[in-house]
């Protein structure tokens, strides 16, 4: 009964799920899996990654647009989720290669020899062959999936508890989240971090146990999984922000002191939002990087979290669908401009190459939206709907 009431009060949620489902079905039918070959496997991967970026953008919108916390660290949680699943993918793939290479030996290899061979394959690039402690569960898919949830959640909980109980707010909190991201990135860049330093984790697109499956089929599976995760995340956060908790959270955004005066434990609400959005960001990262095929520390540098805030601002913060629109719009445009799809512009005295000028265009768009369309693309959409009704 409660579920029907929630959906009845929020028809936009049903519309979003319906559009997402139709989109997924159409892409699947037009992909190489069905033989239609109207959408290439590489573009299916691009769409799948875009859905993951939409999910982390929703998380950012909830923590910033609804709660008023401008976090410049949520892409760090996104990266942690990618590293967590990437460790299992790389270990399992390397284990298969090592076992196959040792199969022809006259004497069976001992577990220690197998472990050393796997370690040398993974960590030889940084001059080591020993497994760090953080790889203790890398051979167990279930435990690594738990790490996708627990590590971002625990880090966000500890950071949030320390920051919110100290009543750090505004730009100071944003600086702290950015410092956390920078510290994590600098740690991961070190060769002795246990995660291969600047080399990162590679070969993540090869799913162990499905070596014979085509990349087209795998890309569709990840597209569907990403769509399901996006739909579930959208419904969950729509439920959160549309209820009593959402009213309190929006009150904290607008006037934290007044909400505190009314007797609400502001820190608990902020900690819940910060932690749950971090977990969702980790899940999005765990789905994104197997489609990207590689993850390295540069992926979670502070600039990535700034891009995330730009996506939400362009789409329209304080609107879940606005975050989706902003992330999808910017990420697809980025793929087009930086992937060679956009033609260069010859001005005679200078050739504008979009691979170099894309970030300038993105920054200009952000300034224009901030000055003239503060509610973003989502706000323009709301205006059009109201005029037609």
Cite the ranges covered by each PLM segment.
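Transmembrane alpha-helices and adjacent helix-loop boundaries
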Residues: 1-389
């Amino acid at each position: 009964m409660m579920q029907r009431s929630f959906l009845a009060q929020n028809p936009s949620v049903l519309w979003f799920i319906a559009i997402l489902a139709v989109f997924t079905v159409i892409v699947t039918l037009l992909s190489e899996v069905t033989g239609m070959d109207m959408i290439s496997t590489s573009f299916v991967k691009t769409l799948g990654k875009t859905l993951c970026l939409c999910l982390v953008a929703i998380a950012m919108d909830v923590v910033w647009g609804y709660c008023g916390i401008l976090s410049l660290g949520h892409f760090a949680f996104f990266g942690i989720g990618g590293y967590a699943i990437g460790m299992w993918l790389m270990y399992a793939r390397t284990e298969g290669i090592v076992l196959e290479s040792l199969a022809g030996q006259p004497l069976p290899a001992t577990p220690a020899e197998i472990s050393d061979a796997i370690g040398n394959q993974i960590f030889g690039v940084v001059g080591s062959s020993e497994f760090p402690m953080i790889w203790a569960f890398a051979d167990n898919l279930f435990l690594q999936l738990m790490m996708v949830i627990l590590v971002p959640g625990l880090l966000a909980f500890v950071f949030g508890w320390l920051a919110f109980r100290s009543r750090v707010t505004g730009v100071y909190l944003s600086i702290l989240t950015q410092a956390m991201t920078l510290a994590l990135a600098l740690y991961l860049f070190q060769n002795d971090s246990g995660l291969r330093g600047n080399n990162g984790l590679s070969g993540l697109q090869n799913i162990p146990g499905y070596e014979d499956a085509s990349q087209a089929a795998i890309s569709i599976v990840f597209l569907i999984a990403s769509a399901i995760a996006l739909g579930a995340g959208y419904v969950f956060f729509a439920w959160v922000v549309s209820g009593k908790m959402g009213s309190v959270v929006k009150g904290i955004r607008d006037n934290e002191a007044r909400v505190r005066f009314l007797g609400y434990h502001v820190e608990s609400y902020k900690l819940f939002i910060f932690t749950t959005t971090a977990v969702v960001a980790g899940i999005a990262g765990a789905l994104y990087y197997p489609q990207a095929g590689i993850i390295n520390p540069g992926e979670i540098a502070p600039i990535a979290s700034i891009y995330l805030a730009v996506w939400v601002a362009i789409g329209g913060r304080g609107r879940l669908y606005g975050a989706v629109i902003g992330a999808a719009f910017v990420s697809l445009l980025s793929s087009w401009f930086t992937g060679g799809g956009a033609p260069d512009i010859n001005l005679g005295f200078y050739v504008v190459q979009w691979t170099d000028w894309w970030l300038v265009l993105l920054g200009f768009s952000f300034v224009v939206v901030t000055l003239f369309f503060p509610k973003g693309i989502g706000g323009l959409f709301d205006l059009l709907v109201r005029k037609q009704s």
